[in-house]
Structure formats: C-alpha cells, structure tokens
C-alpha cells in the first residue's frame, strides 16, 4: 500500500476536535472493471459510512455505479460524486449536475483514434458521453466481462492506451486525459476537474479534516486535482483495495471508540 500519509496517522491531527470527513474512490472499493463489491466488505463499509460523514468519488456514470454497489451502500454515503464530480447524488437522487459541450474537433479526433486503433475486436459503441466527460473503451463501452478480459490481454501486450492518452493530451491541452481503468481512458475539460468536489465538501464541512482513500491510479489521475487541493491536517492515502481499506476503517473505528470512552469519563 502506497501512502502520502502514514498508515497509522488517522489520529495525528492538528485540531483535536475537528470533524473527519472520508472520501472513497470506487476503484479502491471495487477493483476491476465491471466487478461488484464483495458482500462482506459492503456490509462493513455500510456500517462505517452510516456512523460518520463519507463521500464517494468516481469517474464512472451513476448508472454504472448502481450496477456495482447495492442500494444500501450507495445510500450510506452522505453524497456520491459521479462522472468525475460533474454530478452529485444523494439517496439515488441527483442533487447537482454540470454539463459541458465538447468541441466537434475533439469528437472528430476521437473518432479517428478509435478507427486507427490496431485492436481487432472493437465492438461499438466505443465512446461514452457523460455530462462533462468522454470515456473511450476500445473493447466497447458496453463490453462484457469476457470482452474486456480479451481486450486487457491485448492491451497489456501492445500498450496502446498510454500512447493515445499522450496524443490526446498534447492535441487538446485544455482537457485532462487520463487512463482511468485498465481498459479505458477519460477526457474532461480542465475547467470541470475534481477540484469542484473539494470545494463542495469544504463548503459543507468547514474546518473538517478530509481523509481521502484512493487507488493509486485515481489519486494520480482524474482525482488528482481533488487530492492536490487537500492541505494541512488532511490526508491522502493510496490503497490497494478492500483489504487495505478494511484495515484503515477498523483502525478508525477502534480509535473513535476509545475517544468516545475517554469523553464519557
């Protein structure tokens, strides 16, 4: 597990009475494209989120999120930032949505990119349009787990996605381009980055300490602007998956139980 902060530093705060707000990344909760959350871990996560302010951040659409997390887990979060923060959901209801119209030049270039890809088993549609995001998956945005597995094996051998990401970022510097999963890349305008998520949480939780638990790819990719905006006693912890998160949550629950006992004396 890679961390910007020490694993056991949840209790090393500059403001002893500060509220802790947790922000989780979907890729850290459910590693693997199209996978569903482990049942036992889902119960543990729901218990944790019901007892403290927790948010979820993901680059995927809310419809895809619904297929990967059960209703009880989704509703345990104080809010869900979907489509790289372009949407805020609460209780399966959209609270806020910002939209962006991408240029014809960008669309045309993306069409050429997918047409020129050497991958032989492309299955349209290959481009998914979110409220302020464009996702490209050469296996197909509606590909089955089997199709994604076949494409992933091909991509691991040919390493085509990093080349496409670099080309797009160079061609369209006013957009952020990241490989947001093993099988897809994400395009967002720089004016609609996940910095919006930080501002929204800061406005809802003044003086709170934000503890962010992210997969390395997300922390260094689409969620980078959010993570970079954290400062002071805030923490960014890169986790390898549910096992790492379970340890972190267990530690936090024990720490809070100890604090509550001391406060009651």
Regions found by a protein language model. Give the residues of each.
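Metal-dependent phosphoesterase signature
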Residues: 13-36, 94-98, 102, 116, ...
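Active-site phosphate-binding/coordination module
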Residues: 34-126
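Conserved acidic, metal-coordinating active-site core of Asp-based
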Residues: 121-212, 218-221
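Short His-Asn-centered micro-motif
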Residues: 24-25, 57-60, 213-216
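Non-catalytic pre-domain segments flanking phosphatase-related domains
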Residues: 1-26, 37-43, 72, 261-264
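Mg2+-dependent phosphoryl-transfer enzymes with acidic/Ser/Thr/Gly-rich catalytic loops
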Residues: 4, 15-17, 186-265
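A general structural motif
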Residues: 17-19, 51, 77, 131, ...
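Short loop/turn segments at strand-loop or loop-helix junctions that form parts
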Residues: 22-27, 82-86, 130-131, 136-141
């Amino acid at each position: 597990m890679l961390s910007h902060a020490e694993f056991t530093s949840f209790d090393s705060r500059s403001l002893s009475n500060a509220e802790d707000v947790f922000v989780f990344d979907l890729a850290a909760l459910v590693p693997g494209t199209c996978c569903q959350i482990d049942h036992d871990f889902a119960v543990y996560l729901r218990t944790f989120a019901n007892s403290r302010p927790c948010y979820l951040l993901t680059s995927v659409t809310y419809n895809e999120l619904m297929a990967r997390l059960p209703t009880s887990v989704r509703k345990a979060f104080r809010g869900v930032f979907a489509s790289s923060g372009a949407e805020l959901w609460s209780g399966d209801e959209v609270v806020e949505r910002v939209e962006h119209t991408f240029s014809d030049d960008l669309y045309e270039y993306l069409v050429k990119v997918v047409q020129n890809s050497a991958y032989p088993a492309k299955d349209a549609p290959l481009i998914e349009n979110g409220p302020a995001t464009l996702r490209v998956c050469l296996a197909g945005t509606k590909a089955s787990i089997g199709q994604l597995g076949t494409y992933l094996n091909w991509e691991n051998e040919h390493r085509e996605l990093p080349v496409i990401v670099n080309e797009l970022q160079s061609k369209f510097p006013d957009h952020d381009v990241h490989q947001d999963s093993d099988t897809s890349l994400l395009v967002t305008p720089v004016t609609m980055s996940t910095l919006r998520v930080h501002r929204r949480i800061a406005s809802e939780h003044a003086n709170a300490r934000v503890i962010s638990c992210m997969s390395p790819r997300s922390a260094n990719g689409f969620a980078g602007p959010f993570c970079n905006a954290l400062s002071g006693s805030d923490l960014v912890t890169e986790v390898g998956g549910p096992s790492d998160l379970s340890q972190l949550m267990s530690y936090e629950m024990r720490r809070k139980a100890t604090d509550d006992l001391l406060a009651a004396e």
